[in-house]
Curated annotation (Swiss-Prot):
GO terms for cellular component: chloroplast thylakoid membrane; photosystem II reaction center. It is a single-pass membrane protein. It comes from the Eukaryota. PANTHER family: PHOTOSYSTEM II REACTION CENTER PROTEIN K, PTHR35325. This is Photosystem II reaction center protein K. Its main location: plastid. SUPFAM superfamilies: Photosystem II reaction center protein K, PsbK (SSF161037).
Length: 54
């Protein structure tokens, strides 16, 4: 299987990963959304250090 065939199959299988055309401008933002839970975890440490880990 060549790389081109693999890429085509992968795109067809990931059709649900594509945003509808109306939401296309938000595509770069959607790519970064999975980092939000990590930011909340870091915020918890910043908060606890601010209150001296009570």
């Amino acid at each position: 299987m060549s790389f081109e065939n693999f890429a085509i199959i992968t795109l067809k299988e990931n059709v649900f990963a594509l945003l509808p055309e109306a939401y296309a401008p938000f595509d770069p933002i959607v790519d970064d959304l999975p980092i939000i839970p990590v930011l909340f975890l870091l915020l918890a440490f910043v908060w606890q250090s601010a209150v001296k880990f009570r």
